[in-house]
Amino acid sequence: MKNTRLFMFAACTLFLAACGRQTVKIMTPPDASNRVLFGAEQLQATLDKAGYQVMMQQGDTTFSDAEIKTILLTEVNDTTLKKEGFHISTTGNLTRVSGRDGSGVIYGCRELIDRVNDSDGRLNFPEELKDAPEMVLRGACVGLQKMTSLPGHGVYEYPYTPESFPWFYDKEQWIKYLDMLVANRMNSLYLWNGHPFASLVKLEDYPFALEVDEETFKMNEEMFSFLTEEADKRGIFVIQ
């Protein structure tokens, strides 16, 4: 009986705590790009973790409730912003994140995310802020090569196979890595291999050029499709 009372007390406490959470609304336009939606998802995850009740609204971007903290994400044709640049403005309970492009919106969201994380969850948003990356390409290089030559292959010949590069086929790890690149405002991923075409391209006139079996080739196609799609919605170019 005592344990039952303790359980009910704990449940009621959690319920009341949830009811008392501040609500934050994130609004995106009906035609929001994948990058804008990705920025919204990243922001939502951070606010959820910080203890806020997050409402996602795509379509109507009218600021209709001044009592609710609202974040509006939009792409704008603002020539005063550089490529990948953003403008954050806050008036009352409305914070606007305007990006010159989808990447600009992502970086504007990252600015808000950093401020939430650096202030113990407080919504310390700037009244006015414009910023943009200084360098055109900012990225990381991942080597798909080894320190020694493979038996039966020449220099720089390292076919993409699960046996040689098992980590390359780990989608969950790639998601974490791509998110890390975004958090550091990187926009390019360089996959370094001296001769990648033998693992990725089939030519009718040169069937012998393919150095992996059909199953591995299809696996490589699927992985590159996955990797480029996930990278693109984060504003990242995959350069092979």
Region spans (language model):
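Acidic, contiguous N-terminal accessory segments
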Residues: 6, 19-92, 122-126
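Amphipathic, positively biased hydrophobic alpha-helical segments used for protein targeting
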Residues: 10-11, 119
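Feature activates predominantly on carbohydrate-active enzymes
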Residues: 23, 42, 46, 79-85, ...
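Hydrophobic h-region of N-terminal signal peptides that target proteins for export
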Residues: 11-18
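Bacterial N-terminal signal peptides that target proteins for export
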Residues: 1-8
